[in-house]
Amino acid sequence: MHLRADAGAPPAGTPGSLSLVHAPTLMQSRLAFAGRSSLQSPNAVDDCFSALRRIATRVDRDRAHLTIEGDPMAASHATAGSRSNRAVLLTVTCLGQFMVLLDNTIVGAALPDMQHRLHTQLTGLQWIVDAYVLLVAMLLLSGGVFADRFGRKRVYLTGVAVFTAASLLCSLAPSLGWLVAGRVLQGIGAAALSPASLALLAAAHPMPQERIKAIGLWAGLSGIGLAAGPVAGGVLTQAFGWPAIFLVNLPIGVVLLLVGLRHLGESRNPSAPAIDIPGTVLSVVTVGVLTYGLIEGGARGWTSPVILGSFAATVILLAAFVAVEARRSAPMLPLRLFGQRLFTVSNTAMVVVGFALMGSSFFFSQFFVYVQGSSVLHAGLQTLPVSLAMVIVSPYAGRLAARYGFRIVVTTGLALAGLGLLALGMVHADTGYGNVWWRLGLAGIGFALAMSPLTGAAIQAVSPQEGGLASGISSTTRQIGAVLGVAVLGAIVRTRQSGGASFEAGLNSAFLAAGAITLATALFTGLWLARSKPAEGTAAPRRSTDPGAVTTSNGASVNSH
């Protein structure tokens, strides 16, 4: 007997509905509930919880609609039955997201060992990272739709199975090609697992206050994966070699499958829109072709017909994507949202955040190993200031934005991140760690200050019905920036090396470029956020029939399409 997700609840996309924010920070999940409080209001957080209390009252009135599969008269037992499994469900969803986030950072520590054992160049390392991030970025929006249409438990466990099997393939990969293929499959699994885990958690907590607590725990506990990645990667690689960083996922995945099959209840949204297959395919191919040109350009030469052809194909594919999305009734990416200046500015800045953060992080361990001569384990520990700063500062970013406004906090964060990266561009082989760690920490603080307020700005730029969609797009744009960051900064390093410069000089150029772009974005964002206003009110949203309505993509849980 499983709890069905068709009880009365706040409409998806309203201030009380859950918005998918992929970044694993507590305040980002809180900001997703912020609704449409004033852009500069110091009372934004208070307004958020006041709105949730009002919605909770409405939910209480609708609890009579709660049904259980196979026993429509057992409404009175629904809440008690679900509570008995909530601890298990929270553990299962947190562990799944932990795996996804761990793989975002654990690979970086192992890159030097991969390069040595697989006899690959910088280009190969770029593909190892970008193959995973690319698929997560481009399939994340559609993953939530799959979960709503085909069942959240089914999609979650399928994602776990694919991710676990792909991890085994990665650990056994005899060559670079097999490893990249495994990373592609990992990305597909992660894109299904992540939004489905959040949807499962929301469906089990129909009361808004309960959702906030559950999602806060989900975000906080799973976010430990970010901080644990560099250390775990260094320890495992030093002791057993790079395959061990993927083998660590196997016991977690097996446990999740066994427990999930037994204890998770199924839920879905029957009114979810059709999956935008043409848009999804075109988005993956477009970004993939562009990434190919950027990564391989340094090796083949920027004037190579293949590279020039890839850039030309990118333009054609992008035009096709825009044309397809403009004509669909339920597009993966509603282009009309970019008519809001605030939405466009916040997502543009989020691309730069992903670009600079992931692009620079790709080289941190390589700098400590190849330039300063550290061991793989030591290098993993030396990169900790970035992730620790982000984990510590992120919970306060939303509060600062509520008090001082998005413009001040975002501009300050981007400026600090840019200055930190510029400072990293001036370190050398003989620079002591005492003069390096603060540069890493400064960049981490800056990125943490910028990310969740940028998501909040994107949410407030649109109507309440589309708040979840806005947060999902914000997460996707950051991931796209991450793909491009690894590709572009890697191209800078390789181009400098092909011109006779040392690897150290190439790294300095890459860090300086990332810092300059981030500082320029701080100026651009500060100017344009000051002139932007949230979207005006629209018609009241329609009531969803799904109490677990989680807007994870193109309004999968919104009935307004």
Functional labels for PLM-detected ranges:
Residues 83-102, 107-109, 118, 122, ...:
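12-transmembrane solute porter fold
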